[in-house]
Structures are given as C-alpha cells and as structure tokens.
C-alpha cells in the first residue's frame, strides 16, 4: 500500500526539517506536522525569516512546500486519523524526578503520544520512532497502542532515528551518510519497513538505507551520539595537557586526524559540547548500562560527561583567575550563546554554565548571539541559576547584571574581558584592532573556539588565552 498521508507529531528541530525535505522529495504525499504548541505552529506558518528552527536552506524549502503538500497545525486527532504513517518526533528529556532521575529518558510525551494515536485510530498505522529513545521503547509503545484500542487495528512500530547535526540538518537530510530503519521480522513489519524505504529511496541511494531489527536501530542512535561526544571530550582532555606542556591542541588535532584510522571529524577543542542530544543520550546509555548491571560500562561513558563539565568549568576558572578573582567591578562579554554556529538552539550550551559561574562570582555580563533571542538567553540563565535553589529575588538580582546586546560592538563596549564561546563565522571576521578602541584599558580575550591568532592580538595589546594553547 502506497503512503498518501503522513502525520508528524512534534514540530521541533527534528520534525520540522525532516518533514519539509520529505514533502519536497515526495510531492504526492500530504504531510501534516502537528504540535500542541500554538505559538510554534504560528511561527511555522508565519514569516519565513522567523521560523522556530533556524537551519541554512530550510526557509527556502518551506517556501516551496508549505500549504502545497506540507501543513502545520494543532489538529492532532484529525491528522492522526487520515494518516497511514505517523512519525513521533516529540521531546524525550532527561527525567528530573523519580527512578532514574538525572539519567533516564522521560518518556511521558512518547507514552501520551501513543495513547492518543491508539484512541483516535480507526485503521492500520505505521508508527515511526523519530525521537531518540532507550532500547526496547518500541516494545512499550506497541503495548500501549494495542491495549488502548478496541478496533483490532494493526500497529507496526519502526525505529528510524535521525542523524542530523544542527546547523547542517538540511544537507544531512539531502546527503545522509545512512538512513537506519529498524522493524520486526514479521509479514506486516517487513511491509512497513518497505513502505518507509520507498519514501527515502526517492533521494537516498538504496545502499545507504540500512535495515535492522528495532533494538539495534534504537541502540545505534544512542551509541552514535555517545561516540561523537567521546571524541570531543577526548580532545578537550588533551587541550588541558597541551596548556601544561607547551603543545598546541590544534596542531595535535591535525596530526592525529591525518591518521585515516581516526580521521579529523569532531577533533576541534572547545569549551565543551552542548545541544539537546549528546549529554542526554550518554546519560541514558549510562542508565541502561547500570540497569543491566554493567557498572564498568556505565562509568566509562559517564566520564565523557564529566570531562565535558570539567572543560567548561576550567574555562570559567581561567577567566576568574585572569581577573585576579575579583569580578565585582568587571564587565565580561560573552560572544555566542547557541551551542554551535548556524543554529538558534542553546540547549545545554556551555555558555549557559559559564554565565552562571561568572554571575555568581559578581560579574556583569554583556551577551550577544546573532540568532538566539533575548527571551531565550534570559530564560536559559534563570533556569540554570534556579538549579541552586536560589529565591526569586536573588535570581532577579543576578539577572539585573545581564545585558543582551543586538550586535557585537555594543556587546564589547567598555568590556574588561571578551569570551568567544560559539564559532559563528562573523566572529572570525572581527577587526580586533578596531574593537580594542571601544573596550576598557588592557582588554583580555578568552578564545574558547580557537578562532583568533594569539600573537597578532598580543601585538595589539590584548592579553590572550586560547583553549589548548600555552
């Protein structure tokens, strides 16, 4: 049976771009992206320059398919009812309470999604896990679907994890390294897999579409993110050693990456990885490992997160040390709030932890990011500070020391220290000679992304610290 209608539940960083590309490549399929958040849906239907997800190339695709065969709405039940295939792209945050708190994935949204699908469905459905989920979640989803529907409907649950890097998501969708589809080895399961393969094969070569059982697919997504994060933590641990020994981490990265067995990807030292996936998925892997009694395995992967936290904290301590441990009369500029360039996503960004540390030590902050909104930056800081149990008035007092700026120049004006935290291209083009004229006397530059030439800036009169360099 050919798929004529797709419903995607969840209009976020995964659902929006993925469905846009499928709509572009499969114009005969009607796709409804639904979400309970009316503001988010309004944004998807609004100005192309202000979509809720910023990805290079996304707005152009949306302009071609929106209201043609791609629709955004809050009509969840209606969209489920008419769809033959339903993608689940809802959030799976780390649990904040109960068993597994701080490690396990919170499957509340997934479970509610499954219950709603079961309640509404009047015909057979193919259900596709697009969210990153723990191993054997498909089994739980299947149980919920079957136990909450009285019409003897067949639900086939597939795992089809996304492997998108924010900032390059559209290119990743067009030119995927692989598309992974996990399904049950049953007659209906194989038909369901074939239906999804048919959709992707419209633009992805068949040899890059990998089919496995459901459990291998679910685990592969967690392991992929864990191993990418592991590489970042590995080179970040070496950056600390470089600073002590006189080696340069960028030179070490190049030398190591030229070994074809290792390769150069994810060997750029920074103040720490961020984003919605890496930390969450590693902690999920830790929890699963502990659940099965694999304590040594759990400890191994948890150390990846510990090194990441160490790197961010180390950067903050270096800043405090550079200002003689007295931040009360100091203004510090944070350039970059998104966890990486070419995205407006600030989830788990190292800038958030850095800002909290500096504020609690008395600094005044001026923050600039070309894509992250003022609202989001203030929200992130408040949310992070509240983890320490501070009262509302204490939090407001700290927030009063934060200024979110509209451009780079206003962010560094009269600043004592500038911290480069995100690798935005515009930060690579800064004229530091001109910048020095509007900063305070004897300015200091902390480069957490290896973007500047240390000797050049020192010749201009800056004190310079670059992560991973003596």
What is each stretch, according to the model?
Residues 1-470:
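Structural/interface elements that position substrates and couple domains in central-metabolism enzymes
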């Amino acid at each position: 049976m050919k798929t004529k209608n797709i419903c995607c539940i969840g209009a976020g960083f995964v659902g929006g771009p993925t469905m846009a590309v499928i709509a572009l490549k499969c114009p005969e399929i009607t796709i409804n992206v639904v979400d309970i958040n009316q503001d988010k849906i309004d944004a998807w239907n609004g100005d192309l320059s202000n979509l809720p997800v910023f990805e290079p190339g996304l707005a152009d695709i949306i302009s071609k398919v929106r209201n043609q065969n791609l629709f955004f709405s809050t009509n969840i039940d209606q969209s489920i009812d008419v769809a033959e295939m339903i993608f689940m792209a809802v959030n799976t945050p780390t649990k904040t309470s109960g068993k597994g708190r701080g490690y396990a994935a919170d499957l509340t949204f997934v479970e509610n999604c499954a219950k709603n699908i079961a309640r509404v469905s009047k015909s057979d459905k193919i259900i596709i896990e697009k969210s990153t989920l723990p191993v054997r979640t498909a089994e739980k989803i299947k149980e919920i679907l079957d136990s909450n529907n009285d019409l003897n409907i067949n639900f086939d649950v597939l795992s089809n994890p996304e492997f998108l890097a924010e900032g390059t998501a559209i290119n990743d969708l067009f030119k995927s390294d692989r598309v992974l589809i996990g399904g049950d080895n049953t007659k209906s399961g194989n038909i369901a897999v074939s239906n999804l393969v048919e959709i992707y094969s419209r633009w992805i070569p068949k040899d890059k579409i990998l089919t496995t059982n459901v459990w291998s697919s679910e685990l592969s997504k967690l392991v992929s993110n864990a191993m990418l994060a592991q590489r970042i933590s590995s080179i970040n641990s070496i950056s600390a050693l470089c600073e002590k020994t006189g080696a340069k981490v960028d030179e070490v990265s190049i030398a190591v990456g030229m070994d074809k067995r290792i390769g150069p990807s994810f060997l750029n030292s920074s103040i720490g990885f961020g984003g919605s996936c890496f930390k969450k998925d590693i902690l999920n892997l830790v929890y699963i490992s502990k659940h099965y009694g694999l304590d040594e395995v759990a400890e191994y992967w948890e150390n990846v997160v510990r090194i990441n936290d160490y790197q961010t904290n180390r950067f903050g301590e270096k800043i405090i040390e550079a200002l003689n441990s007295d931040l009360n009369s100091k203004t510090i500029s944070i350039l970059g709030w998104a966890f990486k360039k070419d995205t407006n996503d600030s989830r788990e960004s190292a800038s958030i932890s850095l800002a909290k540390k500096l504020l609690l030590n008395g600094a005044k902050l001026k923050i600039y990011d070309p894509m992250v909104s003022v609202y989001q930056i203030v929200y992130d800081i408040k949310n992070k500070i509240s983890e320490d149990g501070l009262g509302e008035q204490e939090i407001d007092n700290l927030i009063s020391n934060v200024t979110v700026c509209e451009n780079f120049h206003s962010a560094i004006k009269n600043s004592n220290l500038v911290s480069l935290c995100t690798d935005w291209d515009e930060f690579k083009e800064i004229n530091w000679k001109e910048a020095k004229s509007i900063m305070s006397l004897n300015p200091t530059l902390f480069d957490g992304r290896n973007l500047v030439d240390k000797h050049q800036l020192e010749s201009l009169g800056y004190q310079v610290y670059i992560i991973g360099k003596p």
